[in-house]
């Protein structure tokens, strides 16, 4: 966020906020090693809240999964969006 946008009170878009949160989570996991992913339920709830602003979905329509294979971590997010 630049100083000008801070002073003018411009709001960040939800996509950029979500991107920042995911970057923080990934950075935290890399520093913390192989700690369990206890943030996944909270991440799933937040994703449902954000997506629900635009499309009607329920908690069952989204799946968040973290898989670890040696030195590789994959965060998988599956979202079922109803047809219009």
UniProtKB/Swiss-Prot annotation:
Coiled-coil blocks: none
Signal peptide: none
Keyword annotations from UniProtKB, A to Z: Cell cycle, Cell division
Pfam family, one: MinE
One of the GO BP terms on file: regulation of division septum assembly
InterPro entries, sorted: MinE, MinE_sf
Family per similarity comment: Belongs to the MinE family.
NCBIfam families: minE (TIGR01215), PRK00296.1 (NF001422), PRK13989.1 (NF010595)
Function text: Prevents the cell division inhibition by proteins MinC and MinD at internal division sites while permitting inhibition at polar sites. This ensures cell division at the proper site by restricting the formation of a division septum at the midpoint of the long axis of the cell.
Name the record gives this protein: Cell division topological specificity factor
């Amino acid at each position: 966020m630049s100083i000008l946008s801070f002073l003018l009170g411009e709001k960040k878009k939800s996509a950029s906020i979500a991107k920042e949160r995911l970057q923080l989570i990934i950075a935290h996991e890399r520093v913390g090693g192989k700690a369990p992913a206890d943030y996944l339920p909270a991440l799933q709830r937040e994703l449902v809240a954000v997506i629900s602003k635009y499309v009607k979905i329920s908690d069952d329509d989204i799946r968040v999964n973290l898989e670890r294979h040696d030195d590789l971590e994959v965060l998988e997010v599956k979202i079922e969006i109803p047809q219009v």
